[in-house]
Design a protein with these regions (language model features):
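Beta-strand-turn-beta hairpins that frame and shape the catalytic cleft
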Residues: 4-13, 152-161, 184
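A short C-terminal boundary segment appended to hydrolase-like catalytic domains
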Residues: 261-278
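Cys-nucleophile CN-hydrolase/nitrilase-fold catalytic domain and related Cys-dependent amidase chemistry
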Residues: 24, 33-114, 118-122, 191-207, ...
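Active-site catalytic loop in hydrolytic enzyme cores
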Residues: 99-180, 193-202, 269-272
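N-terminal glycine-/serine-/threonine-rich phosphate-binding loop
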Residues: 1-45
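Residue-level recognition of beta-strand->loop/alpha-helix junctions
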Residues: 17-19, 49, 122, 219
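CN hydrolase (nitrilase-like) catalytic-core segments centered on the catalytic cysteine
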Residues: 70-90, 159, 165-254
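Short beta-strand scaffold segments in enzyme catalytic cores
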Residues: 91-93, 106-110, 151-153, 234-236, ...
Length: 278
């Protein structure tokens, strides 16, 4: 169990960009190296991308490597690295096998700096889409069971609202979290290249602006063993929609300071969240 978080004025957070493969052990080694870089650079909280531990050759492969909730290679790794590095880890998504039937949950697990798991959010909006003009078809719901609960967790950077990838297209997910006091949102993702070019930055900045929240988005990037290509462009945006940091291509880490005092003043002087009438 994590301790109550002291009120801080500015907190350094990191977003990790990866090109995950179909080998869990190799992906965890890459994640370990990048998390070490984030911690060494002063991050208090680090976000891993969606599917950080496994990008299989087929979507159905998630079922074969899914872990039971509470223990397993990936979950043990996350707890250990959070404790050893002394940082919080918001761990993209991990396939968890505790849903009815054969489908798994795409679970975003959060670990505090003592290695304790403090939150779980299951991806709600599933990507069942045919990409316009491309021979790309996605049916996440064939292998993933949707979540149904919001994810809110106190962190060193304030109250965090959890989301995953396709969730970002649904502003109604974020509004109740902002109304409940969320100060920042995380968006681990594995965006397609066409939709990334068209919408990625616009959607992230919109979610930040309309809720006066920071948004931290960690992405998959590059060519994967399935033949799929992901967009990358990990990004950190402030409550005013200003891009604080980004990594377009390649694997790596970006960092930014979340100025919570400036956010409080902005919300006081521009109280749009209190002006809602619908």
């Amino acid at each position: 169990m994590s301790k109550p978080q002291a009120r801080l004025e500015s907190v350094t957070v990191a977003a990790v960009q990866m090109t995950s493969a179909a080998d869990v052990a190799s992906n965890l080694q890459s994640a370990a190296t990048l998390l070490e870089q984030a911690a060494a650079a002063g991050a208090r909280v680090a976000l891993l991308p969606e599917n950080f531990s496994f990008m299989g050759r087929r979507d159905a492969d998630k079922r074969a490597i899914a872990e039971r909730d509470g223990s397993g290679l990936v979950q043990d790794f996350l707890s250990r690295r959070a404790r050893e590095l002394g940082i919080w880890i918001v761990a993209g998504t991990t396939p968890i096998a505790d849903t009815p039937g054969e489908r798994v949950a795409a679970a975003c697990l959060v670990y505090d700096d003592q290695g304790g798991r403090v939150a779980r959010y299951d991806k709600i909006h599933l990507f069942d889409v045919d990409i316009p003009g491309r021979a790309e078809k996605y049916r996440e719901s064939a292998n993933i069971a949707p979540g149904s609960r919001l994810g809110l967790v106190p962190t060193p950077a304030g109250l965090l609202g959890l989301s995953v990838c396709y969730d970002m297209r649904f502003p109604e997910l974020y509004r109740p979290m902002a109304a409940a006091g969320a100060q920042w949102f995380t968006v681990p993702a594995a965006f397609t290249v066409p939709t990334g070019r068209a919408h990625w930055e616009t959607l992230l900045r919109a979610r930040a602006i309309e809720n006066l929240c920071f948004v931290v988005a960690a992405a998959q990037w590059g060519q994967h063993e399935s033949g799929r290509e992901t967009y990358g462009d990990s990004i950190i945006v402030d409550y005013w929609g200003t891009v604080l940091a980004r990594l377009g291509t390649g694997q790596g880490v970006i960092l930014a300071d979340l100025d919570l005092q400036a956010q409080r003043l902005a919300r006081r002087d521009f109280p749009a969240l209190s002006h809602r009438v619908m």
